[in-house]
């Protein structure tokens, strides 16, 4: 890494006669073009297909998540059709936008070269790189978090009301994608409490403007919840594990920590922790360090505490990586200037991140164990749909029923006519499918029931149909590899 500038702001430095911003722009353009090509090399993931089904049922919110992912997919498929490209198009653009916001944040807080290094590190962290081509809630969440981080610093530095209003709107839009984005308001409040020069903003017309803008932007979620009996609260309650008695599960904490080492890579994650502690101890008097710590530590601490009681998914900490990357680069650039012999550690860490990220991208095209294939959930669905379509044609069925939203969503996306699919009847609010009209069984109704793993019928399905038989058992395949085991039953009433 090159030595850092002594300035605390943006500088027009040159690298081989070219500004770092121009290198970053070229890098973003090349990476974006690659991702637009690569994202069509494999099928949708179950969550992507599920959100695509949501996009066909416009609503102000959905049972499991906010509405923005469905709205974004609806726009993508409006432009490019119901295709993998249409579903994922905006994921790639959002990732490019996130990279730009990361670069600008580091540029504002430090200098051009620090910003360029942050761009490079962001591209080789597996969690961010792999997630950049999947149209889930994460590209939206991370983009709006990064934009909010930039806007809040602009708001603090300038005091201009337009930045405070836009900040609230951006955090509100992030909330429409992923509810964790509201925590950014807490992060900002913590910084304002911590930083004496900025403390006057804590209770002011500026912060009030931010809260009002956030309320307006996030209003669809609250209005939908009022109408549906706060289903989002129920879903969050179920996923968090707090509906069970609290207990300390050290194995879950260990699982959480090891998963972070995996999705960030061990050396980069350890380097991030060292940077956090080092800057906290030695440069905590700087407003920019306080700000970055306020954007990084709360999310990490919250999920670490949550892992004591329940399982935490590796991708949940993704928004915190925006500040984490800047902390990492800022600390280690300064440290290596003082201790040049440690330069090899930085290069090994970057090299490991690059190798892991490249390996994850090419793994799907080689016969490796599924547990090492980052995209295995997005493989085999075309062959799955071929088996279902063959069973439909052979048995002349009226309905398609799945035991889980994964199969139901994939059948609806990959079958040629995009038929409406159903899940067995369940309690209202149990899943998004329960909020839509269900199927009706009459005399002579014939249906296919698609299940995974075990050839079992649910009791509710048995109650609705008086005859059933297994008509197909198969493995979905991708490049000659077995991916997942499925069973298709024919159900009928006579």
Language-model features, listed with the residues they occupy:
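Transmembrane-helix signature of polytopic, membrane-embedded enzymes
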Residues: 11-12, 21-22, 102-124, 143
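Short helix- or helix-capping micro-motifs
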Residues: 28, 118-126, 171, 175, ...
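Hydrophobic/aromatic-rich transmembrane helices and adjacent perimembrane loops
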Residues: 58, 270, 293, 297, ...
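Transmembrane-helix motifs of polytopic, lipid-linked glycan transferases
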Residues: 89-109, 147, 151
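Membrane-interface transmembrane helices that cradle and orient dolichyl/undecaprenyl
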Residues: 107-113, 148-164
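Short acidic/glycine- and proline-prone juxtamembrane loop motifs at membrane-interface regions
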Residues: 127-141
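Transmembrane-lumen/periplasm boundary regions of multi-pass, lipid-linked membrane glycan transferases
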Residues: 173, 184-295, 299-310
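Membrane-proximal, lumen/periplasm-facing interface regions of secretory-pathway glyco-
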Residues: 314, 339-396, 405-436, 449-494
């Amino acid at each position: 890494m090159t030595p850092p500038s002594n300035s605390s702001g943006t500088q027009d430095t040159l690298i081989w006669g070219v500004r770092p911003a121009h290198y970053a722009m070229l890098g973003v353009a090349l990476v974006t073009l690659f991702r637009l090509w690569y994202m069509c090399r494999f099928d949708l993931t179950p969550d992507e297909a599920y959100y695509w089904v949501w996009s066909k049922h416009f609503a102000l919110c959905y049972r499991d998540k906010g509405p923005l992912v469905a709205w974004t997919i609806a726009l993508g498929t409006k432009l490019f059709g119901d295709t993998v490209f249409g579903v994922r198009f905006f994921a790639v653009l959002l990732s490019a936008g996130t990279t730009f916001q990361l670069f600008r944040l580091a540029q504002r807080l430090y200098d051009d070269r620090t910003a360029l290094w942050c761009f490079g590190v962001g591209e080789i962290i597996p969690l961010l790189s792999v997630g950049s081509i999947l149209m889930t809630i994460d590209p939206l969440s991370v983009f709006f978090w990064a934009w909010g981080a930039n806007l809040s610093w602009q708001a603090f530095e300038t005091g201009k009301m337009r930045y405070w209003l836009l900040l609230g709107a951006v955090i509100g839009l992030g909330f429409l994608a992923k509810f964790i984005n509201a925590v950014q308001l807490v992060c900002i409040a913590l910084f304002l409490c911590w930083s004496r020069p900025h403390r006057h903003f804590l209770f002011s017309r500026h912060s009030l403007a931010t809260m009002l803008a956030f309320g307006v932007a996030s209003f669809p979620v609250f209005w939908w919840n009022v109408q549906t009996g706060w289903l989002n609260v129920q879903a969050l309650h179920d996923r968090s594990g707090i509906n069970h008695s609290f207990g300390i599960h050290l194995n879950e904490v260990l699982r959480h920590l090891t998963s972070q080492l995996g999705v960030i890579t061990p050396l980069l994650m350890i380097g991030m922790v060292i940077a956090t502690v080092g800057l906290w101890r030695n440069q905590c008097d700087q407003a920019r360090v306080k700000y970055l710590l306020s954007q990084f530590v709360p999310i990490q601490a919250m999920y670490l505490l949550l892992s004591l009681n329940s399982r935490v998914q590796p991708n949940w900490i993704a928004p915190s990586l925006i500040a984490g990357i800047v902390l990492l680069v800022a600390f280690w650039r300064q440290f290596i200037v003082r201790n040049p012999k440690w330069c090899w550690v930085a290069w090994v860490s970057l090299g490991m991140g690059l190798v892991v990220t490249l390996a994850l991208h090419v793994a799907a095209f080689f016969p490796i164990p599924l547990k090492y294939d980052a995209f295995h959930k997005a493989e085999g669905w075309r062959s799955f749909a071929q088996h279902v379509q063959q069973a439909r044609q052979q048995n002349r069925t009226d309905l398609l029923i799945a035991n889980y939203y994964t199969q139901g969503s994939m059948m609806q996306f990959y079958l040629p006519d995009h038929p409406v699919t159903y899940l067995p009847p369940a309690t209202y609010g149990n899943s998004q499918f329960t909020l839509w009209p269900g199927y009706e069984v009459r005399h002579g109704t014939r249906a296919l029931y698609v299940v995974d793993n075990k050839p079992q019928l649910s009791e509710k399905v048995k109650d609705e149909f008086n005859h059933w038989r297994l008509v197909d058992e198969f493995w979905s395949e991708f490049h000659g590899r077995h991916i997942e085991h499925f069973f298709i039953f024919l159900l009928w009433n006579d």
